[in-house]
């Protein structure tokens, strides 16, 4: 599909190294999971299918994925497990401070393009005692963790990114064949952003702030539902997502 063909534009290195592997948490009926499957088969990558949220930690240790495709609930579970393991004593205090240090680091990166010396120092102080352990829980090889299917809490995103866990967020719908906006490598980090238009797509914001999409992978119509199909497109052919958003210059 078009989405699968466009993915190498964002993950060229990952998709051309056969030693890399992908762990999927999304259902196989999900359009993004399908697209990832297609490109992995084409790139001869190993694909692991997670058993479920209850076996998350064990699945991560078996797969040791380079790429993870997850819903926000998976990252929430990893965070909660780390917090509970730290407990309420001295380790708990250290973990809480590490969370704040990671978040503040990424907030400075988002606001200024880079973090200041103090934020860098605080972040580095927690790396060997907190962040490194977190990365090992995720299998120790993660280069790309894509969260989709629901909004990811910006504070949670800032924590993982600040801890050296490469979490990326995108935006899309089944009608757009999964992602139509994404955070590719090299695009500056902005907290709360879902990135830029995916190759082959155009995005615009209507007067009522609705996100509208046009592109080669946008569906043409609903099956045997002409009324819904007509209501879903503007007169000039843009798909009405029904979601609100804004585009930053």
Named regions from a protein language model:
Residues 3-10, 36, 77-82, 146, ...:
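Adenylate-forming
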Residues 73, 150-151, 217:
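Alpha-helix/helix-capping structural signal
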Residues 27, 149, 172, 195, ...:
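Active-site glycine-centered loops adjacent to acidic/histidine catalytic or metal-binding residues
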Residues 152, 161-166, 173-192, 225-228:
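Active-site loops of AMP-binding adenylate-forming
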Residues 1, 172-176, 241:
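Ser/Thr-glycine-rich phosphate-binding loops at phosphate-binding pockets of nucleotides
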Residues 197-200, 204-249:
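Conserved ATP-binding/catalytic segment of the ANL
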Residues 2-22, 28-131, 141:
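Conserved AMP-binding/adenylation subdomain of ANL enzymes
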């Amino acid at each position: 599909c078009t989405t699968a063909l466009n993915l190498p534009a964002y993950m060229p290195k990952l998709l051309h190294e056969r030693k890399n592997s992908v762990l999927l948490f999304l259902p196989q009926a999900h359009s993004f999971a399908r697209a990832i499957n297609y490109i992995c088969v084409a790139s001869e990558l190993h694909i692991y299918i997670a058993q479920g949220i209850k076996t998350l930690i064990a699945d991560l240790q078996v797969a040791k994925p380079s790429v993870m495709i997850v819903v926000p609930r998976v990252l929430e579970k990893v965070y909660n497990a780390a917090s509970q393991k730290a407990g309420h004593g001295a380790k708990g205090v250290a973990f809480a401070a590490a969370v704040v240090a990671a978040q503040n680091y990424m907030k400075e990166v988002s606001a200024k393009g880079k973090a200041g010396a103090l934020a860098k120092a605080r972040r580095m102080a927690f790396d060997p005692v907190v962040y490194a352990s977190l990365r090992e829980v995720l299998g120790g090889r993660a280069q790309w963790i894509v969260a989709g299917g629901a909004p990811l809490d910006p504070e949670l995103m800032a924590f993982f990114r600040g801890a050296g866990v490469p979490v990326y967020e995108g935006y899309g719908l089944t009608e757009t064949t999964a992602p139509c906006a994404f955070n590719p490598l090299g695009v500056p980090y902005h907290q709360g952003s879902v990135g830029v238009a995916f190759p082959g797509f155009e995005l615009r914001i209507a007067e009522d702030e609705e996100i509208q999409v046009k592109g080669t992978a946008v569906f043409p119509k609903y099956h045997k539902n002409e009324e819904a199909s007509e209501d879903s497109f503007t007169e000039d052919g843009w798909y009405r997502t029904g979601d609100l958003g804004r585009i930053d210059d």
